[in-house]
Regions:
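Helix-turn-helix DNA-binding module
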Residues: 113-137
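N-terminal interaction/assembly modules
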Residues: 1-96, 124-128, 143-146, 150-163
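Short amphipathic alpha helix immediately N-terminal
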Residues: 98-114, 118
């Protein structure tokens, strides 16, 4: 078996997907921060070994947790700044697209993390025969998405030719 041939639009898909991955990393980091904030100040469980443990060990763990918490907050700030820059870049390219349906497909799926059925409903849900031909409209949504990727690739290449 041969490896799947890369498509010319893969560079755009990767750019758009990287935004979603970054959002997920930010969400996960926020959860880690919340967890550490809850546990950093709480006393640790008593040792049942019978061996005395000094308060030095406890404060050392608390210090490590507080340091880790500060590092995560700095990391979160950096990721949030990167997310804002990436979103701005993507939104600027979307603004240059001429077809509103293409814009909506890209915005909903990649920026809003909507699934394809939700995108299809947004684009075609007002059609009188939508419920009857939902699968056809979903396929039409995929075609619009493919066309949108081609349009974004052209815009991306034009913007990066200047750099």
């Amino acid at each position: 078996m041969s490896a799947k041939q890369p498509k010319e639009t893969d560079v755009i898909k990767e750019l758009l997907s990287s935004y979603g991955k970054l959002q997920k990393r930010i969400d996960n980091t926020e959860e880690r921060i919340a967890f550490l904030e809850e546990t950093a100040g709480s006393p640790s469980s008593p040792s049942l070994s019978g061996m005395p443990s000094g308060s030095r060990e406890r404060s050392s763990k608390q210090e490590r947790d507080l340091i880790k918490l500060e590092e995560l907050k700095e990391k979160l700030d950096a990721m949030t700044a990167e997310e804002n820059m990436l979103r701005e870049e993507i939104e600027e390219m979307i603004e240059l697209m001429e077809k509103p349906d293409e814009q909506t497909a890209i915005e909903m799926h990649y920026l809003d993390q909507a699934n394809w059925r939700a995108v299809s409903v947004a684009l075609h849900g007002n059609e009188p025969d939508y419920d009857e031909y939902e699968e056809r409209y979903l396929k039409k949504t995929f075609k619009i998405h493919g066309s949108a990727l081609q349009t974004l690739l052209r815009i991306y290449n034009e913007r990066n030719a200047d750099k």
